[in-house]
Amino acid sequence: MTFFNKLRFSLSRRLALLFVLITIGSSGSAASLFAEIPDYVQPFSLNPVNDGIQLGLGAALSGSALICDKFVDFKNNEYNPEDWKKSDVPTFDQIFMRPYSKPLHIVGTGTTALVLAAPAIFAIMPSSEWLTIGTMYVETLLIANGLKEWTKLLVYRARPYMYFDDYPEDKLEEGDWNCSFPSGHTTLSFAGAAFTTMVFCQCFPNSNWKYAVAGASFGMAAATAVLRMASGNHFFTDVLVGALIGSAVGFAVPYLHTKTFYSKFERKSKTGQASLTPAGFSFVYNF
């Protein structure tokens, strides 16, 4: 076993241990959070038109991408090593290029699952709010997933591990080897982190836990991004764009359900006032 293989093996074990410790620690923090429920504010509400548009958009993006991926040949999946040379990769992406590591791949998938499960903390809210929060989260995931899937379909980029001799041949057979941009795990992780942070800070503006929730959510999302690079699945620019897409959707969808957003479309009340003066009759109409 070479020095680099030993280093990768050691890193994999340590990251796996860290993943377990974070999971246990998160459980303890969640218990404390549930024990001290802060004052709740109701900033979000559903709207038939608004949610019809967002659910429809998310379903259309994700559904059409799935259909095109399975039944329409968008990409040429024939692999030619001569087409993919490390020297053609931008310098800042070369720095983080790594061969494939299955252990780190698995740990990265685990951190993604943890971030996506983070909104479970909103069980501390009144049950009457669960439908609103749940609907917003479904919209967030559908839109974020649809955007990253369509980008993957339209952008032809080999994954970093394909530039190394020991690339996984099963990935080549699956046709996933040229879907590097953007990082799907990172997109969904940051969407979950941004959603959790936005909703918690809006619903519990005076809570001392909001910084911890934001830090833990984005910290786990960032760990996912690092693991996706370390496992050889993505370049730096893949995870960067994925983080931007996920964060944008994660913040935008909850905002589009706030009273602040709805107030911009409320019509001002129309009132009329009539009065009789020595000079005659006057009528004032406010709109």
Regions found by a protein language model. Give the residues of each.
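Hydrophobic alpha-helical transmembrane segments of multi-pass membrane proteins
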Residues: 103-107, 134, 138, 183
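N-terminal transmembrane-helix/juxtamembrane module of multi-pass inner/ER membrane proteins
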Residues: 32-116, 154-169
